[in-house]
């Protein structure tokens, strides 16, 4: 007796994975990555700190207002918001494996150094360790934005045109490495090794002499020593900064009522 049941159609070879309903991967139904939020999805920033709420409400509109009151930056989105899109540059300076001896043997992780800057007086360095290269790079980039500091620029001689060099000699030290920055005349350029030169370019310094001593082959210490030297440019009060200034209120105090409304909302 012939079989009268209709034959079932086989799924097409080029059918998408979501239609096959295989449910593979951590994303579960619909393909790998959907359950975790794929890389193309960007969540809206919800500030967690008072400073973040003021930045999102456009009550604080520049990094100089934050540095004036020495307010800590706890969210990297603050830097992304205050620096115009396309002006903030980042670059991986160094990444290498590090090991730790445990009871189960050697545990290998990766340490990354990242630099961010707008080439206009702001520079940040971040160093983080991760189990994977991508995790270490992302963590170091976030740390660099949280560690961003202002760089004061000045003149070598007459005050003509825009500031082009550092205003005084400064020295930064990390480990056995010491980096000294010396002001240079306009047109000199950055006289430095490749690693400090990249950091000085990101800081917006056009002309400077440099000298270094110690174990400069340890690039991590060389990077941090250059960063510490640039950070010291705001550690001196030169005569042009001796003028009296009127004190102003802290942004968190000035906009206290707005912050209270945001908290209760």
Curated annotation (Swiss-Prot):
Q: Where is the signal peptide?
A: none
GO CC list: cytosolic small ribosomal subunit
Q: Which NCBIfam families match?
A: uS5_euk_arch
Stretches with biased composition (Low complexity): 1-15
Basic and acidic residues: compositionally biased ranges = 246-258
Species assigned in the record: Leishmania amazonensis
Q: Which residues are listed as membrane-spanning?
A: none
Q: Which family does it belong to?
A: Belongs to the universal ribosomal protein uS5 family.
State the organism's lineage. Answer: Eukaryota, Discoba, Euglenozoa, Kinetoplastea, Metakinetoplastina
- Please describe what this protein does: Component of the ribosome, a large ribonucleoprotein complex responsible for the synthesis of proteins in the cell. The small ribosomal subunit (SSU) binds messenger RNAs (mRNAs) and translates the encoded message by selecting cognate aminoacyl-transfer RNA (tRNA) molecules. The large subunit (LSU) contains the ribosomal catalytic site termed the peptidyl transferase center (PTC), which catalyzes the formation of peptide bonds, thereby polymerizing the amino acids delivered by tRNAs into a polypeptide chain.
- Which residue stretches belong to region Disordered? 1-44, 245-265
Q: Which Gene3D superfamilies match?
A: 3.30.160.20, 3.30.230.10
This chain's protein is named Small ribosomal subunit protein uS5
Known PROSITE patterns for this protein?
Answer: RIBOSOMAL_S5, S5_DSRBD
GO biological process: one example: translation
**Start and end residues of each S5 DRBM domain:** 88-151
Lineage top rank: taxon = Eukaryota
> Mind listing the GO molecular function terms for this protein?
RNA binding; structural constituent of ribosome
